[in-house]
Every structure is written in structure tokens, then in C-alpha cells.
């Protein structure tokens, strides 16, 4: 096989993989629009089935209109951008990969959503520390750590430590269903329920609204 044939084969293989992992917005004003995934196979996009299940469960528990969202290990940004399409006011995307940040930036630009988003290119522990020191608070947090390097439990601890979840806010943690168990809830939070969707285990956590003080 000639060098040009090898290049053509690589390009066609990449395009097939790109089609396999092609993602579209499920609902909202950007319904049906396609999202670009970061080049390469290190990023595992959340499947459409899993995203639809996540947002269906959230829809009966919270109103996305006007909420502030934190998308950790954002990858292509599909969860955060789906939130924007459904009415979220602002999303902060966190990922250490510059390729992921470039894909998120391109997706936001093509959907004209850049003014409602911030992209933090940083290792997650450092990023959450900086958000905590700036007193950021979020109504909805997505944690989609790589299955082979599952840092979900550590991230949940940091969310509680830095007080990043607003009262009444939700945290959604996506793991492999083969992971030992859903992580325990961080301090001042509760694990509401866990769902299995295909190869994914999705755990939902909530920070309860403080009880009113007695007069």
C-alpha cells in the first residue's frame, strides 16, 4: 500500500469513527444540531441514550431555565451545551485537554452560545480550587471522569470542600457500571438515586435546601 493510500485509509477510518461518535443536541432551541468531538479516541462522549436519560430525570426535579452549570471532564461539552440549549444561563466547562477545549470552543461558536460559557483548561483539582476561591456556586454539576481513571469520588469531596454546589443544587456523576460502587455523597449532600443505562451508571446527588430557622 502506497503512502497516499495509507493516508486515505487513516482519513476514512477517522471519518467513520467521527460518524459513530457524532453527537446531536437532543432538545431545546439547538435541537438536532451536531456537536464536534475532540480529535482522537481518548475522549469518551456521553451517549445520546445516556444524555437523554439524564435530562429526563433532571426535568422532573429541577427547572433548567436560568441555572448555572459546571461541566467537569467536559470532553466535547455535550452535557453543558445540552443544558444551554434547554435554558441554562451559563456553563463553566473544565477539562485539562486543549483538544477538548478547542472542540468545546468550536461547538459553542457554531451554536452562538459563546457568551454564555467559560472554558477552564486545567487539571480538575486546581480548577475546582480556583472556582472555590472565587466563591463560584452552581445549580447543576456534571462529573464525567474517564472510566479508566475514575476520579469521581475525589471530585465529589472537592465539590463539598469548596462549597461549589448551591442549596437545592444537583450533581450528576457518570461512571462505568463495572465500577465498584457509586461514590458516597460529599458533606452536606445526599445521594438521591442511582440509575444504570447501558454501560453507564449514573448517580444523582442533591444538596438539600437548608431548613428554615426557628423564630
Predicted feature residues:
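Class I S-adenosyl-L-methionine-dependent methyltransferase catalytic core
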Residues: 2-215
Amino acid at each position: 500500500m502506497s503512502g497516499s493510500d495509507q493516508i486515505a485509509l487513516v482519513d476514512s477510518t477517522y471519518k467513520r469513527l467521527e460518524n459513530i461518535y457524532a453527537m446531536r443536541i437532543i432538545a431545546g432551541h439547538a435541537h438536532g444540531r451536531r456537536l464536534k468531538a475532540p480529535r482522537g479516541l481518548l475522549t469518551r462522549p456521553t451517549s445520546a441514550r445516556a444524555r437523554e436519560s439524564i435530562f429526563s430525570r433532571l426535568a422532573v426535579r429541577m427547572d433548567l431555565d436560568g441555572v448555572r452549570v459546571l461541566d467537569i471532564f467536559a470532553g466535547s461539552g455535550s452535557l453543558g451545551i445540552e443544558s444551554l440549549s434547554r435554558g441554562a444561563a451559563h456553563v463553566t466547562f473544565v477539562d485539562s485537554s486543549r483538544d477538548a477545549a478547542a472542540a468545546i470552543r468550536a461547538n459553542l461558536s457554531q451554536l452562538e452560545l459563546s457568551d454564555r460559557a467559560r472554558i477552564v483548561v486545567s487539571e480538575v483539582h486546581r480548577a475546582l480550587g480556583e472556582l472555590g476561591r472565587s466563591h463560584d456556586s452552581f445549580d447543576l454539576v456534571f462529573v464525567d471522569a474517564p472510566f479508566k481513571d475514575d476520579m469521581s469520588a475525589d471530585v465529589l469531596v472537592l465539590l463539598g470542600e469548596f462549597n461549589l454546589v448551591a442549596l437545592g443544587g444537583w450533581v450528576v456523576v457518570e461512571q462505568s457500571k463495572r465500577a465498584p460502587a457509586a461514590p458516597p455523597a460529599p458533606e452536606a449532600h445526599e445521594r438521591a438515586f442511582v440509575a444504570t443505562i447501558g454501560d453507564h451508571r449514573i448517580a444523582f446527588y442533591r444538596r438539600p435546601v437548608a431548613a428554615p430557622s426557628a423564630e
